[in-house]
């Protein structure tokens, strides 16, 4: 993974969240810049990202065949990387901080989006655009608990996303804490993360209208 250091220095990329608002993002925009997709992004018809990131063992274990069908560069948590052919393992049990060298350690930050931000920084991107980062979920029970979803998934862009699968309920407060680490790290290096997600539930990053980037 060291060979990826700064290969996209000075460039713009898009990190794609999997919220319902992603359905309103034109595919043409997703093909405009280098892209990071996560978890079940492959359910989005007509699209495959340049880089794929997954750090959740539940997702990887249940969806390994679909992930293996992707032809992009894949960064996978090291404990599950043996299931994904040709993937680059990342040590995703790092201390709670923004990690600048994800081939050594990476902090998950309770959201795979934060993992993607650390990798994007390592690859040298100076502008990161966010779409589909709705940061809103409907669920019962406590955050960060394992549950089985026996109905359509209304928290993601596809009703099939976690339908009939196990998932971990989100911890939005801790995710925001991680986002603040990313915001501070990018700003300190004259880089920027811009949230283009309409009605996003997180206010950590600068907000802009997606239309201005089309």
Task: For every predicted segment, state its role.
Residues 1-214:
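Metal-ion/cofactor- or nucleotide/acyl-coenzyme-handling active-site neighborhoods
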């Amino acid at each position: 993974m060291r060979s990826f250091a700064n290969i996209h220095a000075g460039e713009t990329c898009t990190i794609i969240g999997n919220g319902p608002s992603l359905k309103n993002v034109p595919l043409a925009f997703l093909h405009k810049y280098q892209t990071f997709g996560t978890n079940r992004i492959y359910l989005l018809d007509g699209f495959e990202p340049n880089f794929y990131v997954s750090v959740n063992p539940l997702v990887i274990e249940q969806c390994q065949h679909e992930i293996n069908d992707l032809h992009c560069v894949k960064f996978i948590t090291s404990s599950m990387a043996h299931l994904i052919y040709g993937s680059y393992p990342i040590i995703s049990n790092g201390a709670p901080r923004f990690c600048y060298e994800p081939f050594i350690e990476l902090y998950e930050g309770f959201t795979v989006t934060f993992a993607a931000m650390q990798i994007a920084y390592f690859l040298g991107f100076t502008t990161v655009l966010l779409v589909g980062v709705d940061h809103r979920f409907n669920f019962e029970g406590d955050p960060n608990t394992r549950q089985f979803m026996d109905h359509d998934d209304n928290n993601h862009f596809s009703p099939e996303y976690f339908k009939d699968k196990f998932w971990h309920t989100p911890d939005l407060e801790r995710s925001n804490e991680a986002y603040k680490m990313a915001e501070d790290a990018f700003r300190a290096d004259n880089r920027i993360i811009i949230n283009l997600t309409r009605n996003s539930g997180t206010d950590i990053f600068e907000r802009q209208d997606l239309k201005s980037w089309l």
